[in-house]
A protein has these predicted regions:
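Active-site catalytic loop in hydrolytic enzyme cores
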Residues: 1-11, 104-167
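Cys-nucleophile CN-hydrolase/nitrilase-fold catalytic domain and related Cys-dependent amidase chemistry
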Residues: 45-128
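Generic preference for flexible, low-structure residues
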Residues: 37, 79-83, 140-144
Length: 167
């Protein structure tokens, strides 16, 4: 069973030119994945500065959308990403590191979409639980004694932002 949520955000606006997408070429360290699954993510200053540099470079290149890989962002950084999205009018889509709640290891995708509400810049933060976990990912989660969530129904968000559709 599949559930598709269609979200329309600033559909009255259009891109002046073709939208520009920045894909971060960054290393996802196994040590960061493991510490995150244990509930102690790496929130060091150097790591934060690496993300800040990638975002700044993408903005300078004129990106409208910034993509990061799976397991790359601690959820504690999401509020900073949302502020950046709001200020720079850049959508950010990233795979969050595992989020441990009780005995379950969750894997979320976050989509941060800039909006203007009554003349004020803001950002909408959308979390979606990953539907399908890789075999090795399940082994890591179970190896630490946690359960792997199985969403039912599978959920997908179809986002229409400024008349650009993506999921």
């Amino acid at each position: 069973e599949v559930e598709i949520n269609e979200l329309h955000i600033n559909t009255n606006e259009r891109f002046e030119e073709k939208p520009s997408i920045s894909i971060a070429n960054t290393q996802v360290k196994l040590s960061n994945i493991e510490t995150s699954v244990k509930g102690k993510p790496n929130l060091g200053n150097q790591r934060y500065l690496t993300f800040a540099k990638l975002l700044k470079e993408s903005r300078k290149e004129g990106a409208n959308i910034f993509l990061l890989p799976e397991f790359s962002v601690p959820y504690e950084f999401v509020s900073s990403f949302a502020k950046y999205s709001e200020k720079n009018k850049m959508a950010i889509i990233a795979g969050l590191e595992h989020w441990k709640v009780d005995d379950v290891g969750y894997n979320f995708i976050v989509s941060i979409i800039p909006v203007k509400v009554n003349g004020v810049n803001d950002a909408i933060v959308l979390y979606r639980l990953k539907n399908h976990y890789a075999h090795v990912e399940e082994l890591i989660i179970r190896g630490y004694g946690y359960k792997v969530p199985k969403p039912k129904p599978y959920r997908y968000d179809l986002i229409n932002w400024r008349n650009l559709y993506f999921t």
